UniProtKB/Swiss-Prot annotation:
The keyword tRNA processing applies. Pfam families: Intron_maturas2, MatK_N. Usually encoded in the trnK tRNA gene intron. Probably assists in splicing its own and other chloroplast group II introns. It comes from the Eukaryota. The lineage of its organism: Eukaryota, Viridiplantae, Streptophyta, Embryophyta, Tracheophyta. This is Maturase K. It comes from Rhododendron ferrugineum (Alpenrose). The keyword Cytoplasm does not apply.
Length: 506
């Protein structure tokens, strides 16, 4: 990595606009393949000691283009046969190296922009804020005072040319963009690489980093409108003039359809101090203390912005307006609700006493049991009704490996859903996994569950399923020995960076 940084220490005034030569740097591809494939494939087999080999990369690109016009779509074929060989290696491997290396090159301008932004600024590194659980204390603190919420599913780009057009505002090197446009448009299979799948994307396994970069950039452009409106409602804070003029042009496009001609009036309509925005992957939440009319204006505004700026039809049904008092938010695997908690206060005045009834709003997070049963059923731990089953594919493992796998799955689920207000759903998941583990072991030893547990002892399974790692966490409940309060205590851990997926239990 240090060598990579030294190679990138160029004059920034020149490097900002010219990233095309970096495509022909071999260390770029070695860096891209540092985790996974052999990182020195190019260096070991080319015979060159220098770090730049224009000829071999150029020949490789020409070879890929020739193969494309021969309608031999080897890039994402299921079998890696010997018919697609180039320089003694499989062409799939080289195509993957090109696209992953290209992803590294395109990320460089954004990395340099971040470094220039952080220069001269002292920022506290809070790695714990990267945890997914860190968002729930924020929701608990803010959402209990809000009224309406917009459930937003971010649309996918129907044409990759839209991504190129937005990318050119940040990457000034026309040569690199032309090469990117060529690969995205000339391969017929590109059209099926990014396909809508619920609220996210289905990426190619071989080129996940490349398309993940394009998707994140697309989402970043979607969210730019929120930053713009926030800056405008805060008395025109410092903002890029290019972005400002670009948004002005957008208002001119749709002013006859949506707004009045007064630009200040446009900003005033959306000046809302109690507006909060949260997003994870392709799903976002926009909550406000305003009225239903204001939320409908927001919905209409967002739909028109996405249609005019991205030149695509944005379905209004992808944005739902709900009232927090009677709606549950399905976000990050939790069901979040804002409910009224009755509160009775007894007031004593000399000889008379009064009972005052009041209600306060409380933000609750619950673990949805139905989707979890569905996930466990899909992974063959139980049936659709939640009845535990054995895991035949694990019967060939040792007893300790089987118990450790089941225990690890439960600990991961318990770790993630520790913020659930009620733990009964988690106890049911524990029951399913424990009995599934026992049935798997009994199947392996050709015995009954009762006989096997009698010989093994229930305590061993209990030990594996209750073992917990020592990590930092946040809890807002008062310390108490009352079992009822302990049952309802919520714990937010600071080491969770992704939603637990049963599909990755292997």
């Amino acid at each position: 990595m240090e060598e990579f940084k030294r190679n990138l220490e160029l004059d920034r005034s020149q490097q900002h606009d010219f990233i095309y030569p970096l495509i022909f740097q071999e260390y770029i591809y070695a860096l891209a393949h540092d985790r996974g494939l052999n990182r020195s494939i190019f260096l070991e087999n080319t015979g060159y000691e220098n770090k730049s080999s224009l000829l071999i990369v150029k020949r490789l690109i020409i070879h890929l283009i020739t193969q494309m016009y021969q309608q031999n779509h080897f890039l994402f074929s299921g079998n890696d046969s010997n018919q697609n060989k180039f320089l003694g290696y499989n062409t799939n491997l080289y195509s993957q190296m090109i696209f992953e290396g290209f992803a590294v090159v395109v990320e460089i301008p954004f990395y340099l922009r971040l470094l220039s932004f952080l220069e001269g600024k002292e920022r506290v590194k809070s790695h714990n804020l990267r945890s997914i659980h860190s968002i729930f204390p924020f929701l608990e603190d803010k959402f209990s005072h809000l009224v309406y919420v917009l459930d937003i599913l971010i649309s996918h780009p129907i044409h990759l040319e839209i991504v190129i057009q937005t990318l050119r505002y940040w990457v000034k090197d026309a040569s690199s963009l032309h090469l990117l446009r060529f690969f995205l448009h000339e391969y017929p299979i590109w059209n099926s690489l990014i396909t809508p799948k619920k609220s996210s994307f289905s990426f190619s396994i071989r080129n996940q980093r490349f398309f993940l970069f394009l998707y994140n950039f697309h989402v970043c452009e979607y969210e730019s409108i929120f930053v713009f409106l926030r800056n405008q409602s805060s008395h025109l804070r410092s903002i890029s003039s290019e972005t400002f003029l670009e948004r002005i042009s957008f208002y001119r496009k749709i002013e006859l359809e949506v707004f009045t001609k007064d630009f200040k009036a446009i900003i005033w309509v959306f000046k809302e101090p109690f507006l909060h925005y949260v997003r994870y992957r392709g799903k976002a939440i926009l909550a406000s203390k305003g009225t239903s009319l204001l939320m409908n204006k927001w919905k209409y505004y967002l739909v028109n912005f996405w249609q005019c700026y991205f030149y695509m039809w944005s379905q209004p049904r992808r944005i739902h307006i709900n009232q927090l008092s009677n709606h549950s938010l399905d976000f990050l695997g939790y069901l979040s609700t804002v409910r009224l908690k009755p509160l009775m206060v007894r007031s004593q005045m000399i000889e008379n006493s009064f009972i005052i009834e009041n209600a306060s709003k409380k933000f609750d997070t619950l673990m949805p049991i139905t989707p979890m049963i569905r996930s466990l059923s899909k992974a063959k731990f139980c049936n659709v009704l939640g009845h535990p089953m054995s895991k035949p594919v694990w019967a060939a493992l040792s007893d300790s490996d089987i118990i450790e796998r089941f225990g690890r799955i439960y600990r991961n689920l318990s770790h993630y859903y520790s913020g659930s207000l009620k733990k009964m759903s988690l106890y049911r998941i524990k029951y399913i996994l424990r009995l599934s583990c026992a049935r798997t072991l009994a199947r392996k030893h050709k015995s009954t569950v009762r006989a096997f547990l009698k010989r093994l002892g229930v305590g061993l399974l209990e030990e594996f399923f209750t073992e917990e790692e020592q990590v930092f966490y946040l809890t807002f409940a008062k310390a108490s020995s009352n079992s009822g309060e302990l049952y309802q205590r919520r714990v937010w851990y600071l080491d969770i960076i992704c939603i637990n997926d049963l599909a990755n239990y292997e």
